[in-house]
Curated annotation (Swiss-Prot):
Key words of the record: ATP-binding, Coenzyme A biosynthesis, Cytoplasm, Magnesium, Nucleotide-binding, Nucleotidyltransferase, Transferase
Organism the protein comes from: Rhizobium meliloti (strain 1021) (Ensifer meliloti)
Family, similarity comment: Belongs to the bacterial CoaD family.
Xref: InterPro entries: Cyt_trans-like, PPAT, Rossmann-like_a/b/a_fold
Pathway: Cofactor biosynthesis; coenzyme A biosynthesis; CoA from (R)-pantothenate: step 4/5
Encoding gene (name): coaD
Protein name: Phosphopantetheine adenylyltransferase
Gene3D superfamilies in UniProt: HUPs (3.40.50.620)
Enzyme class: transferase
Substrates-to-products reaction catalysed: (R)-4'-phosphopantetheine + ATP + H(+) = 3'-dephospho-CoA + diphosphate
Marked site positions, Transition state stabilizer: 17
Lineage, uppermost ranks: Bacteria, Pseudomonadati, Pseudomonadota, Alphaproteobacteria, Hyphomicrobiales
Key word Glycoprotein present: no
Entry GO MF terms: ATP binding; pantetheine-phosphate adenylyltransferase activity
Amino acid sequence: MTTAFYPGSFDPITNGHLDVLVQALNVAAKVIVAIGVHPGKAPLFSFDERADLIRAALEETLPERAADISVVSFDNLVVDAAREHGARLLVRGLRDGTDLDYEMQMAGMNRQMAPDIQTLFLPAGTASRPITATLVRQIAAMGGDVSAFVPGAVHQALQAKRK
């Protein structure tokens, strides 16, 4: 049984993240969605809020696979966190060539530190390719409609943050 580790900030989770997650579930029996916690960063949503939004998004979009997905936090190296959770596969989504260049560097460094852990690159679908959590936050903060880019629970949470 393959366990995949899908790290990210997920601030907030977007339809692009869900696209990659669905693909990951096609190759792994279990996927661990790992929220990176960085003490120096001030995310829009707290860890608990992000975890709740991920769970709500899964119930909304992938209820039949929710049992195959867990949500954890980590504040150490991705490869160390993956090992701690028994995962030997890192999942990374790619939107464009810029993502590929960056992710190839990261995969190379991770491979040096942890040769037992492989990185799996999954291309974003056409509809989710332009979506980034940063753009979603910016558009929502200016009162724009982000409902096409995020699950319903996230859209509601972003609206509540704006009030």
